C-alpha cells in the first residue's frame, strides 16, 4: 500500500510540474507571438517608407542595428569596382553570386550589395556596362552583417570563397578602413548592359509561435487530465459490484 501511495504521489508531482512548465512555455510563446507580430509590422513600415540618409559615420560605432535594419536608406559616393567581392547566392533566378562593392562616401566606406549575377557573369569584364563610374546615389535596405559564413560553409577569404556577407571580414580582405558596420541591399536600378540585378531582398520572418503555444497548452491539458484522474477517489467495491 505504501509503495502504491508513493508512486501515486510521484505521478501527482510530475503532472503538477508538467502543468506548470507546459503552461509557462505556452504563455512564453504567446509573448513571442506578440513580439514577432510587432517586429513584422515595424519592418514592413521601414521597407515601404521613403529612403532616408544613411546613418552618419560618427554614429556607426554605437548604431543599434536592431532599430536600423531594413530601413530604406540613401547614400552618395563612388564605387571601388576593383575591390568588389562575390558572395555565393541562390535566388529566384537560380545559383550565382551577390556583387558586393565598396562605396566611398563622405561618411566613410559602405559595402553595397549591388545585386545578383549568374555564374557566367562572375567576371566583371563581362558586365562593364553595369559598373557605374563617378558619383552615384544608391538607395536600398540597410542590413546587418552575416559574420562567419553559413552552416557548414565557413567563409574562406584566402581562397576567395565567400558564403555570407561578412562586412568585417570582407573589409579586412580588401584593405578597407572606416567601414560601416552594415551593408546596403541596393534597389533594382535600370542600367545599360549586363549588370547585377538588385532589389532581390527577401523580407520574411518565420512565425510559428502560435502553433508552438497550442502544442504546449495541449501538453499542459494532458497533465491536468492526469491530475484529475489521480485525485479522483477510486470507485468503492460495493458500488462496482452493484453496477455489475
Where do the protein language model's features map onto the residues?
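Surface-exposed, charge/polar-rich loops and edge strands
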Residues: 1-244
Amino acid at each position: 500500500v505504501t509503495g502504491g501511495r508513493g508512486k501515486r504521489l510521484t505521478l501527482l508531482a510530475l503532472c503538477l510540474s508538467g502543468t506548470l512548465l507546459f503552461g509557462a512555455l505556452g504563455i512564453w510563446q504567446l509573448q513571442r507571438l506578440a513580439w514577432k507580430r510587432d517586429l513584422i509590422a515595424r519592418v514592413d513600415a521601414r521597407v515601404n517608407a521613403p529612403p532616408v540618409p544613411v546613418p552618419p559615420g560618427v554614429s556607426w560605432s554605437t548604431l543599434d542595428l536592431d532599430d536600423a535594419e531594413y530601413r530604406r536608406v540613401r547614400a552618395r559616393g563612388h564605387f571601388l569596382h576593383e575591390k568588389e567581392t562575390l558572395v555565393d547566392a541562390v535566388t529566384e533566378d537560380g545559383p550565382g553570386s551577390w556583387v558586393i562593392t565598396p562605396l566611398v562616401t563622405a561618411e566613410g566606406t559602405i559595402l553595397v550589395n549591388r545585386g545578383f549575377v549568374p555564374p557566367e557573369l562572375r567576371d566583371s569584364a563581362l558586365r562593364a556596362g553595369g559598373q557605374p563610374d563617378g558619383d552615384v546615389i544608391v538607395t536600398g535596405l540597410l542590413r546587418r552583417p552575416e559574420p562567419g559564413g553559413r552552416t557548414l560553409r565557413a567563409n574562406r577569404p584566402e581562397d576567395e570563397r565567400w558564403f555570407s556577407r561578412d562586412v568585417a571580414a570582407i573589409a579586412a580582405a580588401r584593405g578597407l578602413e572606416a567601414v560601416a558596420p552594415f551593408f546596403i541591399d541596393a534597389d533594382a536600378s535600370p542600367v545599360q548592359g549586363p549588370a547585377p540585378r538588385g532589389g532581390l531582398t527577401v523580407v520574411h520572418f518565420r512565425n510559428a509561435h502560435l502553433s508552438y503555444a497550442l502544442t504546449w497548452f495541449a501538453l499542459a491539458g494532458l497533465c491536468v487530465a492526469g491530475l484529475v484522474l489521480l485525485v479522483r477517489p477510486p470507485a468503492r467495491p460495493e458500488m462496482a459490484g452493484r453496477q455489475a
